[in-house]
């Protein structure tokens, strides 16, 4: 997967895949980041490895961050294109070894078919300190500011599924 699109910083975007995990009553999984001093919530997401499709990366990230395995989800939809965000200036050069100026993301809506007990955030490399099911409309306020537009667009893309 190439990171060929450049952001305003002149640095390429890091290819990433994300998951909007939806429970049977229409609430969305949100994890509170373990590495952020404030209450920063986000949905499962992460980089796409070389040779990996965005869908494969999304399913891998779901397992790595939540313990939810592919047999416990039904993939419902994919964002029609890449969604991008730029890192704020204070983070440029500090994350991802300074190689990227933001992310280009493909998002997947997935229906969670399991029980809440299948969610295990105490993974090998934990990213979340706690998790909850949230209304999509409430999720955006808890996201770090530089990702809010991405989340709003993704949730809008999946609005019919979330309704």
Swiss-Prot record:
Coiled coil location: none
Motif (Nudix box): 46-67
Hydrolase in keyword set: yes
Hydrolase is among the record's keywords: yes
Any single Pfam family the record assigns to this protein: NUDIX
Functional summary from the UniProt entry: Accelerates the degradation of transcripts by removing pyrophosphate from the 5'-end of triphosphorylated RNA, leading to a more labile monophosphorylated state that can stimulate subsequent ribonuclease cleavage.
Name of the featured protein: RNA pyrophosphohydrolase
Record family assignment: Belongs to the Nudix hydrolase family. RppH subfamily.
InterPro entries: Nudix_hydrolase, NUDIX_hydrolase-like_dom_sf, NUDIX_hydrolase_CS, NUDIX_hydrolase_dom, RppH
GO terms of biological process kind: nucleoside phosphate metabolic process; ribose phosphate metabolic process
Enzyme class, broadest EC rank: hydrolase
Record-linked NCBIfam families: PRK00714.1-3 (NF001936), PRK00714.1-4 (NF001937), PRK00714.1-5 (NF001938)
Assigned keywords, A-Z: Hydrolase
Organism: Paracoccus denitrificans (strain Pd 1222)
PANTHER family: NUDIX HYDROLASE 26, CHLOROPLASTIC, UDP/ADP-SUGAR PYROPHOSPHATASE
Cofactor: a divalent metal cation
Recorded GO MF terms: bis(5'-adenosyl)-pentaphosphatase activity; guanosine-3',5'-bis(diphosphate) 3'-diphosphatase activity
Residue ranges occupied by any Nudix hydrolase domain in the UniProt entry: 12-156
Listed EC numbers: 3.6.1.-
SUPFAM superfamilies, sorted: Nudix (SSF55811)
